[in-house]
Curated annotation (Swiss-Prot):
Family per similarity comment: Belongs to the glutaminase PdxT/SNO family.
HAMAP family: PdxT
Gene this protein is translated from: pdxT
Organism for this UniProt entry: Methanococcus maripaludis (strain C6 / ATCC BAA-1332)
Quaternary context: In the presence of PdxS, forms a dodecamer of heterodimers. Only shows activity in the heterodimer.
Annotated InterPro entries: Class_I_gatase-like, PdxT/SNO, PdxT/SNO_CS
Pathways per UniProt: Cofactor biosynthesis; pyridoxal 5'-phosphate biosynthesis
Record GO biological process: glutamine catabolic process; pyridoxal phosphate biosynthetic process; pyridoxine metabolic process
Name of the protein: Pyridoxal 5'-phosphate synthase subunit PdxT
Keywords: Glutamine amidotransferase, Hydrolase, Lyase, Pyridoxal phosphate
A cellular component annotation (GO) from this entry: glutaminase complex
């Protein structure tokens, strides 16, 4: 069974662990850089991207994650953290050649749920202060999902990033299955 790490310093950690179990993988909560050893993939969860970024700097995660050669899934704040820029000064991994519009849909009260397409399937997406891709910076970035023309899912190399929270909907498992099939098991 594949071991999927979930960055466990802030955000929706338990919900991601439950989803990883549903796709017959072993979740491993990542609290220190040493916990990165032995994982087959990494999930960077939603939460507050500035807080997660500062904690990643404090705990020494930035360079360690940048040097990983494994698939990475970023959800919501995870998408923000993987990006090249947000227009705001904050720690970023800068691994995904996109810029991000933070909180593109507005504040917490503007959060919503909507059906969108991902990998040829319809998924009930939960958008909570969700980002959108502002600009794609290289030709190897592929669009995975859109919401009314706005880019909310991309992939580049071994990285998948989505602006919604798959861990919060019953059929969100579709996103994890897509990640598993197209990234983790793609050898």
């Amino acid at each position: 069974m594949k071991i999927i790490g979930i960055l466990g310093i802030q955000g929706d950690i338990e919900e991601h662990e439950d989803a990883v179990k549903k796709i017959n993988c072993i979740p491993k909560r990542i609290r220190t850089v040493n916990d990165l050893e032995g994982i087959d993939a990494l999930i960077i969860p939603g939460g507050e991207s500035t807080t997660i970024g500062k904690l990643m700097v404090s705990y020494g995660f930035i360079d360690k994650i940048r040097n990983l050669k494994i698939p990475i899934l970023g959800t919501c704040a995870g998408m923000v953290l993987l990006s090249k820029g947000t227009g705001k000064k904050q720690p970023l991994l800068e691994m995904l050649n996109v810029t991000i519009k933070r909180n593109a849909y507005g504040s917490q009260k503007d959060s919503f749920e909507k059906e969108i397409e991902l990998g040829g399937k319809t998924i009930h997406a939960v958008f909570i202060r969700a980002p959108q891709v502002g600009e794609i910076l290289s030709n190897d970035v592929e669009i995975l999902s859109k919401d009314d023309g706005n880019i909310v899912g991309v992939k580049q190399g071994n990285i998948m990033a989505i602006s919604f929270h798959p861990e919060l909907s019953d059929d969100g498992i579709i996103a994890y299955e897509y990640f598993l099939k197209n990234f983790v098991e793609k050898d």
